[in-house]
């Protein structure tokens, strides 16, 4: 009996730390359906500070949502653009842009590839930490030796 309990405990630890296979774009788009996501780090140089995305009007049957997104402009205000995000397997398509989900926990963070760059997105409630450690692992693993640039810095409240 003790052996069975030990095996179950070991398997629970392994599955709790399993960071593979969570690449569904629709799970990423929906997130927790409240708040939004800030771009925390990217391998792209010169990315605008306080880049964000916020989904609303989620349509399960078409796997689409309205996306509001933008960044902090020179005056310190957040820009605001609206588009439709569509999930296609592990791809998020907004207009002519496609991002590929490398990892999502559907609640606190996502790692995506966009335009050849790796990006770490963190839910607006987790900018000070507490997001899934698999996102840090996948971001580091995917970017390899490419330097990471911090994008989330003293950002105003999300619109």
Swiss-Prot record:
A GO-annotated cellular component: extracellular region
Gene3D superfamilies membership: 2.40.128.20
Primary site of residence: secreted
GO molecular function: amine binding
Keyword line: Allergen, Disulfide bond, Secreted, Signal
Signal peptide, first to last residue: 1-16
GO biological process, one term: symbiont-mediated perturbation of host defenses
Cell compartment(s), UniProt: Secreted
Cysteines joined through disulfide linkages: 50-155, 109-134
Post-translational modification: Not glycosylated.
Species this protein is from: Argas reflexus (European pigeon tick)
One Pfam family cited in the UniProt record for this chain: His_binding
Protein name: Allergen Arg r 1
Entry's family note: Belongs to the calycin superfamily. Histamine-binding salivary protein family.
Domain of life, per lineage: Eukaryota
């Amino acid at each position: 009996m003790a052996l069975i309990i030990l095996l179950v405990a070991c398997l629970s630890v392994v599955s709790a730390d399993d960071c593979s296979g969570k690449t569904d774009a629709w799970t990423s788009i929906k997130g927790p359906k409240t708040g939004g996501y800030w771009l925390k780090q990217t391998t792209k140089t010169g990315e605008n500070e306080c880049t964000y995305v916020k989904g609303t009007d989620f349509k399960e049957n078409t796997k689409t949502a309205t996306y509001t997104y933008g960044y902090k402009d020179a005056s310190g205000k957040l820009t605001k653009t609206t588009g439709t995000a569509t999930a296609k397997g592990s791809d998020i398509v907004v207009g002519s842009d496609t991002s590929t989900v490398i990892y999502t926990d559907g609640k606190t963070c996502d790692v995506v590839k966009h335009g050849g760059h790796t990006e770490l997105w963190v839910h607006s409630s987790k900018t000070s930490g507490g997001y899934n450690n698999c996102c840090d692992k996948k971001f580091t693993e995917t970017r390899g030796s490419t330097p990471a640039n911090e994008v989330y810095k003293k950002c105003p409240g999300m619109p």
